[in-house]
Every structure is written in C-alpha cells, then in structure tokens.
C-alpha cells in the first residue's frame, strides 16, 4: 500500500508538472501569435500610406502635365495626341484670341472715357441753356425803369416845359411811390393838374416839331448840306477802294492776306457798320486762321471771325457771302471743339451753305463746301453717328454719291476751280468702284498748282491714289 501510495503520488506530481508546462507553452504560443498579428497590422497601415502617397504624386504629375498645356478640359485630353505642328497652330489661335480680347477691352475703355466726356459736355450745355433762359425770364419779369435826367436832350424837356421848374420826387416817375401814398383828394388834384400839363406839353411838342421841320428845310438848302453830300460821296468812294483792295489782297500770297487783314482792322472803326465790310473782315479772319500754326491762334481767329460773320448776318439775311463765310468759320472752329459742338457746328454749316447756294447758285464755292460736308459726314465713325442721333432730332446723313454730285457741279461751273475738289472727285470714284474715272481725275488734279493750304495738304492723298490706281 505504501509502495502504491508513493507511486500514485509520483504520478500525480508528474501530471501536475506536465500540465504546468503545457499551460506555459500554450501561453507562449498565444503571445507569439498576438505579437505577430500586431506587427502585421502595423505594416498593413504603413503600406497603404506609401501607396497613397505614390498615387497622389502620380496624379499630381499628371495634373501638372495636363495643366502645362493651355486650353479647356477637352484640350487637355486631345492635345497630347496632336502633333507638334497641330499644337503650335492651336496655341497661335489662342494667342490671337487673347490679343483680340485685349484690344476689345482697350476699345471699350476708350468708349467709356468718350461717353463720360460727352456726358459732361451735355450737362454743361444744358446747364448753360437753363441759366440763359432764367436770365431772360428775369429780364422779362423785372424790366428796367427809366432813369431821370436833367439834360435837355432827354424826356425831362417835357416836364421842364410844362412846369417851368425842376420837378420834385412826387411829380416825377421816380416819386411815383410817394405820390401813390397820398389821399384820394390829392390824387384827384394831381390828375387834374396832370391833364393840364399834358395839354401844355403837347402844344410845346407840336411847336418844337414845326420849328425842327423849318430848320431841316433851311439846312437842306444851305451850302453846308451840299458840302456834307460831297463828303458822303467821297466816303463811299473811299470804302469801295478799301473793299476792292481787300479783295485783291485776299487772292494774293500769304503776306498779301496778312496785309489785307490789317487793312480791314485799321478801317473797322470807320466802316464797321457796313455788311459788305463785315463779311470781308470775317473772311480775313478765316485766312489768318489758316495761316497761323499755333492751335490757340487758329481757334482765336476762327472765333473772332465767326462773331464778325454773325454781326454781318444781323444786318441782312440775303447776302450769299455772309452765309458762305459764316459756314467756313463754323467748320474751322469745329476743328478745335468737342464731339458735341462739332456735330452742332455741322448742322449750322449745312444750313448756311444751303442758304448761300440758294442765293447764289452759280458760285462754285458753295457746291464745293457742300460736297466736302457730304463726304465727311459719310465717313463719320459709329460714336459720332450715335451722338448726333441722341442729341438732335434729324441725324447727319449723306453719302459718297451726294458728295460726288456736289464736287462735279463745282467743276462744271468753273473747271479747275480747286485742286482739292478734283482729289475729292477721284477719291469718290474710287470708293464707288469706278477706278478708271478715279484715275482720270487724279491726273487732272496733278495738273493744277497748290493755291490753298488744303491743296497742299492733299498732296499726300494724291500720292496714295497714284500707288493704288497706278
């Protein structure tokens, strides 16, 4: 039994030892597997991160590659498949589009600036027009009162003759307020005395008129009157000599035109009330505007000449020369003004040229000026046409054909009237597609000498026509 007990105890100890060893081994295996799973999980996280970075880098490189090629999204997919020549053509087209857009932007900015300046001019003109109307209304509402005068040449003679003494404030117009504040009895008394004074004064005026008529008859028959008539006739001869000399100097050289201008200025005080003198002075101002090189001088001469032409027109509306030179000076002044005033001057120019042609249809100058106006109007730009339509009820309208007819009429009335006119005829025919006629008139223009500054300025146009027409 003891031996069996010892054997059983030893077996139990061995089983316990084996169980402990197995448990430890199981724990080791379990820990080892868990550690391996942890390591494997860490690698799996690091590997996708590296792959994602590589893929992102690749995508970035692809995007960079696509973005390096200009164009839209579709172009990015197509351009890599194009040849080098095709890609260059596409890029050239894109450059052209960008250049066109930049030019369009500059034009829009310039148009905005022009419209802003035009708006300012319109506002200024409207404001000045309103102020002028207000001044006229104030003048009509508050007319100027007559002032008292003690001189014998004024209406105070009437009161002196009736009363025989100087008037008090209550008896004169200046004392109307004081007299008006008196009683009814006093006003009635004044009315009766005033009626008596009126009767006396009327008789005085009638006697004075009779005496003056008698004096006029005696003066007309006196030797002094005959001397005055002789002086008037000699004065008329003098002014005719001045006008004739001014006409001759106007047809001469530049120095002659300057002398003619000075001649008229020196005689303005003596003959400035005559219409035929004033329009010649306006013509001389036009000559000086052409001869002057400075911009301010040109504008000043044109402005002064326009004022003289206006003064001449106020003395009569039936002078073709007055209308003609007023139109010329309007055109010269318009060259130094803004777009709004230029268009307004264009309407005034056309109006007075038409009037000059109506009064003197055989004068080639009017037809030449009308042709030049039609030619310039037919070449107005878009902004000028829109401005004319916005500011005026009837916009400016003319064609190259209208201009050609007027130039041909001037040439018909006086062949070789103007070298510039023949150049205009050649240009009109060329624009109408009649090159043979244009070539003919170009050669005719080359035969004429330069008479005016406009003729000299058209020399460049003649050279261009010769190159184009051959």
From Swiss-Prot:
Fill in the PTM field for this protein: Phosphorylation at Thr-160 of the FFAT motif activates interaction with MOSPD2, VAPA and VAPB.
Q: Can you list the GO cellular component terms from the UniProt entry?
A: glutamatergic synapse; intercellular bridge; mitochondrial outer membrane; mitochondrion; mitotic spindle pole; nucleus; organelle membrane contact site; postsynapse
Report the locations given in the UniProt record. Mitochondrion outer membrane; Cytoplasm; Nucleus; Cytoplasm, Cytoskeleton, Spindle
Give the gene symbol: Rmdn3
Region Disordered: what ranges?
168-205
Membership in a protein family? Belongs to the RMDN family.
Q: What is known of its domains?
A: The transmembrane region is required for mitochondrial localization. The FFAT motif is required for interaction with MOSPD2. The FFAT motif is involved in the interaction with VAPA and VAPB and its phosphorylation regulates these interactions.
A Gene Ontology molecular function term of the record: microtubule binding
Kindly list the positions at which Phosphothreonine occurs in this protein: 160
The residues exposed to the Mitochondrial intermembrane compartment are 1-12
Q: Report the function annotation for this chain.
A: Involved in cellular calcium homeostasis regulation. May participate in differentiation and apoptosis of keratinocytes. Overexpression induces apoptosis.
Name of the molecule in the record: Regulator of microtubule dynamics protein 3
Q: How does it sit in the membrane?
A: Single-pass membrane protein
List all topological domains (Cytoplasmic): 36-470
- Phosphoserine sites (modified residues): 44, 46, 50, 57, 183, 193, 212, 233
Composition bias type Basic and acidic residues, residue spans: 184-194
One Pfam match, given by its short name, reads RMD1-3
List membrane-spanning regions: 13-35
Coordinates of motif FFAT in the sequence? Answer: 157-163
What is said about its interaction partners and assembly? Interacts with PTPN2. Interacts with microtubules. Interacts with VAPB. Interacts (via FFAT motif) with MOSPD2 (via MSP domain). Interacts (via phosphorylated FFAT motif) with MOSPD2, VAPA and VAPB.
PANTHER family the UniProt entry points to: REGULATOR OF MICROTUBULE DYNAMICS PROTEIN (PTHR16056), REGULATOR OF MICROTUBULE DYNAMICS PROTEIN 3 (PTHR16056:SF18)
């Amino acid at each position: 039994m003891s031996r069996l007990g010892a054997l059983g105890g030893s077996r139990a100890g061995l089983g316990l030892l084996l169980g402990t060893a197995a448990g430890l081994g199981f724990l080791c295996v379990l820990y080892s597997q868990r550690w391996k799973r942890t390591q494997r999980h860490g690698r799996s996280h690091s590997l996708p991160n590296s792959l994602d970075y590589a893929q992102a880098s690749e995508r970035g490189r692809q995007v960079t590659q696509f973005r390096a090629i200009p164009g839209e999204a579709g172009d990015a997919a197509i351009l890599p498949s194009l040849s080098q020549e095709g890609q260059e053509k596409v890029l050239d087209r894109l450059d052209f589009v960008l250049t066109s857009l930049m030019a369009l932007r500059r034009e829009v900015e310039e148009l905005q600036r022009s419209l802003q300046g035009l708006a300012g001019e319109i506002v200024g003109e409207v404001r000045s027009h309103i102020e002028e109307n207000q001044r006229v209304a104030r003048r009509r509402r508050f007319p100027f009162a007559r002032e008292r005068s003690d001189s014998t040449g004024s209406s105070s003679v009437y009161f002196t003759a009736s009363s025989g003494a100087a008037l008090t404030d209550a008896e004169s117009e200046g004392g109307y307020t004081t007299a008006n504040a008196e009683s009814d009895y006093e006003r009635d008394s004044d009315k009766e005395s005033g009626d008596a004074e009126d009767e006396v004064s009327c008789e005085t005026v009638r006697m004075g008129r009779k005496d003056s008529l008698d004096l006029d008859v005696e003066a007309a028959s006196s030797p002094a009157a005959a001397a005055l008539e002789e002086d008037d006739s000699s004065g008329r001869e003098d002014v005719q000599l001045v006008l004739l000399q001014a006409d001759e100097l106007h047809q001469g050289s530049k120095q002659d035109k300057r002398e003619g201008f000075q001649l008229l200025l020196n005689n303005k005080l003596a003959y400035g009330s005559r219409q035929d003198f004033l329009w010649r002075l306006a013509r001389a101002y036009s000559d000086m505007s052409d001869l002057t090189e400075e911009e301010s001088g040109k504008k000043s001469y044109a402005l002064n000449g326009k004022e003289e032409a206006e003064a001449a027109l106020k003395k009569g509306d039936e002078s073709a020369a007055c209308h003609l030179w007023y139109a010329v000076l309007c055109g010269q002044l318009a060259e130094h003004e803004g777009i709004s005033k230029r268009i307004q001057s264009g309407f005034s120019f056309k109006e007075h040229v038409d009037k000059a042609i109506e009064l003197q249809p055989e004068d080639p100058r009017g037809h030449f000026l009308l042709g030049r106006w039609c030619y310039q109007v037919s070449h107005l730009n878009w902004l000028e046409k829109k401005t004319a339509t916005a500011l005026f009820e009837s916009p400016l309208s003319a064609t190259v054909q209208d201009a050609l007819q007027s130039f041909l009429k001037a040439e018909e009335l006086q062949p070789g009237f103007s070298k510039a006119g023949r150049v205009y005829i050649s240009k009109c025919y060329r624009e109408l597609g009649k090159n043979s006629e244009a070539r003919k008139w170009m050669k005719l223009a080359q035969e004429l000498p330069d008479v005016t500054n406009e003729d000299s300025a058209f020399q460049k146009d003649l050279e261009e026509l010769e190159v184009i027409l051959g």
